[in-house]
Amino acid sequence: MSDAPKSHGRLTISASLRPRELMGEPQVRGAWTANVVTLFPEAFPGIRGLSLTGRALAQGLWNLRTIPLRDFGIGRHRNVDDTPAGGGAGMVIRADVMDAALRDAGDSLPVIYMSPRGRPLTQARARALADGPGVTLICGRFEGVDQRVLDAHHVEEISIGDYVLTGGEIAAQVLIDATVRLIPRVLGNQDSLAEESFSIGNRGLLEAPQFTKPAQWEGREIPEVLLSGNHAAIHRWRASEAERLTKERRPDLWRAYEATHMDPAKDRQLSGASDQSRDHREHRKDHSDEPDRTA
């Protein structure tokens, strides 16, 4: 009788739980929830079902529910779109179809439509969403969604960049990832959030370069200061590098940082980078009318 493990007699070995199957797990009450209205529910969780976000999904730290738009289609063929009013190319998702899907999602969560004409997605917006109960995401297709249903449901439009995709599914996954990673316990080390790009701990600037072993590679060395053990010097170096990179690569952020020397959000119209200094600006405004007591 062979002592070989049973797996040796199998033709294939596969994981017991696949990313898509994670969505079949019972949802955890009170956990952050993403409802996704989409024509392609099989696209989720996608890469969100892997690595840290996938493990967090399996652990119930966040929930994911897809709402197939086709289920609410009209007629025998379950049509979800029609020709644009006023003429033009393409098709537009019908208001009545989208309304039915959003009603199925419920009205307890903010609704966001992933659209290139939306406000830029920022770290501050992702942080605000992570602090809330969740979000309902609309994944657009064709020429978009009938404006009337967006107005009726007070839908916020968010863009992930100045370019156009074939649909909103990838954009929705970007927003989910940017948000879920900020939920406590999702990342293995929450301290890693403190000094990354756009974070408050990094003054809203870009993150400094990172290095690891080996100390020498292809004639290139790790900066000596990072191996010195002098934590104050390392902090100064990283702060200096963050400023240098921001100035070179994101002049919009740098102008904002110079203007406030606190937070790049002062220059929101130029950068669209963050609105996390709003409270600071409002505080200064509230006190601007007070009499000068130093005179």
Language model segments and positions:
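Hydrophobic/aromatic beta-strand patches that form the interior of the parallel beta-sheet core
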Residues: 35-37, 65-67, 110-112, 135-137, ...
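Long, low-complexity, intrinsically disordered segments
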Residues: 278-295
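Oxyanion-binding "anion nests"
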Residues: 249, 262-271
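Long, charged alpha-helical interface segments
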Residues: 198, 202-261
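Structured adenosyl-cofactor binding patch, chiefly the S-adenosyl-L-methionine
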Residues: 145, 149-196, 200
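S-adenosyl-L-methionine/SAH cofactor-binding core of RNA-modifying enzymes
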Residues: 92-141, 146-147, 184
